[in-house]
Amino acid sequence: MLAPFACQPGESRGRQKPESMSTFRSPFQRDRDRIIHSSAFRRLKHKTQVFVEHEGDYYRTRLTHSIEVAQVARTISGVLGLNTDLAECIALAHDLGHTPFGHTGEDALARLMEPYGGFDHNAQAMRIVTRLERHYAEFDGLNLTWESLEGIAKHNGPVEGPLPYALAEANAQWDLELHTYASAEAQVAAIADDVAYSHHDLHDGLRSGLFTEADLMELPVTAPAFDEVDALYPGLEPMRRRHEALRRVFGRMVEDVIAVAQGRLEAAQPKSVEEIRQMGATVIRFSKPLYQELKVIRSFLFHRMYRAPSVMKERAKVTAVVNDLFPLFMARPELLPQEWRRDVEAAADETTLARIVADYVAGMTDRFALQEHARLCG
């Protein structure tokens, strides 16, 4: 049974294009299923978060990460009486707008798009689900419910200041109330992202040899976990020791989020999702002690993983790939695939063309971007 402050599927604000109700699935289940079956979701299989060529087995892809985020979101939302389908839907959609080559690729594309309104992966996810997926006879995009769109747009909180192009375009159509907080389900999806990447980046970094268990014995959160495992299982083989320690780190993060949320919900006693949106602060968050400890972990990961020599070595290379492909397609849009030509021919100005080229480049997988660069620029 859903809590009164959960998003009730029978009270959805609906879809841009009205559709008949499904006999067997709720509106949010249909949204989730459409995301899973989308082309953009499938492409996440070949997009890495940390790009190191020839070392892909060590690192999560955007697809595996999204699945892990969805699992965490379902767990937390289920305990809190929230709508697990909506939380899962937003979690699965949160990375759809990412470029090839992780944040390095996004930084390069964002710089190239500065004269044309910029580029932001969260806004690009909105563009994908409202416009770029073209599989249905009656609409472009996925025709998601308002609640799913709201969660994609502002799962990280109210959106202030100048809006990225894609988000401004979507908000003009749907009025996503960007000045308010999102539903509790969207907040759960956001913190599930933090839980998942904090956990799996530690795991991936250990597997790839960027740091060792001894390094983690010097850090908060991880050190007590290894101490507990060593006390319970002296002499445990390294791989099992590592897994047992990191699953305890993972469990502590999830339990902390649930405990804090239960306390805040008990204190606020919200009677509806609208009261959640108007609370003026997130109801889903880490406790202050754990948040401070996780800041230490993130700083460690930034220096030892995201700025590791093997990762930095690739940054210039993949930046060049994006820097070469974007202006090439701008100058010669006829090189774009046939299915993109209609949009190119309809482009009224250079800014519109740049947005089309950015859509195409952002949709590339790591492997395809490298192949296209070798073919067209080699």
Curated annotation (Swiss-Prot):
Pfam hit, one: HD
Any GO molecular function: dGTPase activity
SMART domains attached to this UniProt entry: HDc
Disulfide cysteine pairs (residue numbers): none
Keyword list, A-Z: Hydrolase
Ranges for domain HD: 62-198
UniProt region (Disordered), positions on chain: 1-28
Gene Ontology BP term (one): dGTP catabolic process
NCBIfam families given in the database record: dGTP_triPase, PRK01286.1-1, PRK01286.1-3
Protein name: Deoxyguanosinetriphosphate triphosphohydrolase-like protein
